[in-house]
Curated annotation (Swiss-Prot):
It comes from Streptomyces coelicolor (strain ATCC BAA-471 / A3(2) / M145). Its main location: secreted. SUPFAM superfamilies: Concanavalin A-like lectins/glucanases. Its EC number is 3.2.1.81. This is Extracellular agarase. The active site is at residues 155, 160. The keyword Signal applies. Residues 33-309 form the GH16 domain. One of its GO terms (biological process) is carbohydrate metabolic process.
Length: 309
């Protein structure tokens, strides 16, 4: 736990968290106190209230991977998968220090990219709200906070950001995917990106870009909050710094030819990874970029999850 001096220092800078916390080097902090500054932006509905889920919430206010970490998280893929494209998921490339979970991208000897990967030991179920305060990396890899079902069929991307990009590096890219695994096919999906002021910036299905991003922050330059309210099997609301930016439901983008939708629990995932479509286009991090600690790390200050009860 940080001392009183650290707490005072953090309190002074935390006032800007709603608009993003800028700064070259994240410092120690009192995140367990800090997230309480931010009311859950979503209403729990009915006569329910929000109850914190300690099993899926962490202030990362410790060092290394003690039982505090290991009781909640796995630092490798649950099935031992190495990851997509040139990813090589690695437990050695995530750690906790200075009040942050740090997830790193670094060159592997075989030419692939070591990618830190952390997932919750147990899944969560709706109705819930989950949110991270994070700073994306500056790499050509994606910086992510997402949810995935145990059978790898249902996926919700709260944020998937390519921090190196001048425009897309300003987007909170949200998405859903519904897969069939055998034989593999993608049954349904929809991706949309949003700027920090809440404006619509990108349609991933058509490739359309809306606005030039002038005056919008590059997400690699500061901490921002990214959250999702999983309301039901067919309803999700996405929040950027506490602002509602997207409603996903059957009246707009949500489809499922199976008519099951998101009817099963999902695990939380915090990671970085390589994507095949970018590899195919030659968009890959260089050795120098992967060795540069000023851009090759994602910093997660905290993750909090609440159940509506």
């Amino acid at each position: 736990m940080v001392n009183r001096r650290d707490l005072i220092k953090w309190s002074a800078v935390a006032l800007g968290a709603g608009a993003g916390l800028a700064g070259p080097a994240p410092a120690a902090h009192a995140a367990d106190l800090e997230w309480e500054q931010y009311p859950v932006p979503a209403a729990p509905g009915g006569n329910r209230s929000w109850q914190l889920l300690p099993s899926h919430s962490d202030d990362f206010n410790y060092t290394g991977k003690p039982q505090t970490f290991r009781g909640r998280w796995l630092d490798q893929h649950k099935d031992g998968w190495s990851g997509p494209a040139n990813s090589l998921y690695s437990a050695r490339h995530s750690w906790v220090a200075d009040g942050n979970l740090i997830v790193e991208g670094r060159r592997a000897p075989d030419g692939r990219v070591y990618c830190g990967y952390v997932t919750s030991r147990t899944p969560v179920e709706y109705p819930l709200y989950t949110e991270v305060l994070m700073r994306v990396s500056g790499l050509k890899l994606s910086s992510n906070f997402w949810l995935l079902s145990r059978d790898d069929v249902n996926e919700i991307d709260v944020i998937e950001c390519y921090g190196n990009e001048s425009l897309h590096g300003k987007h909170m890219n949200t998405a859903y995917h519904i897969f069939q695994r055998n034989p593999f096919t993608e049954l349904a999906r929809s991706q949309k990106g949003y700027f920090a002021d809440g404006s619509y910036g990108y349609n991933g299905e058509t490739g359309q870009v809306f606005g030039d991003g002038a005056g919008q922050p590059l997400l690699r330059n500061g901490f921002h909050r990214y959250g999702v309210h999983w309301i039901s099997a067919t309803e999700f609301d996405f929040y950027f710094n506490g602002r509602l930016v997207r409603r996903l439901n059957r009246s707009n983008d949500l489809r499922d030819p199976r008519s099951r939708f998101f009817d099963q629990p999902m695990h939380l995932i915090l990671n970085t990874e390589s994507h095949q479509w970018r590899v195919d286009r030659g968009i890959e991090p260089t050795d120098a970029e992967l060795a540069d600690p000023s851009i090759n790390n994602i910093y997660y200050r905290w993750v909090r999850t609440y159940q509506a009860v």
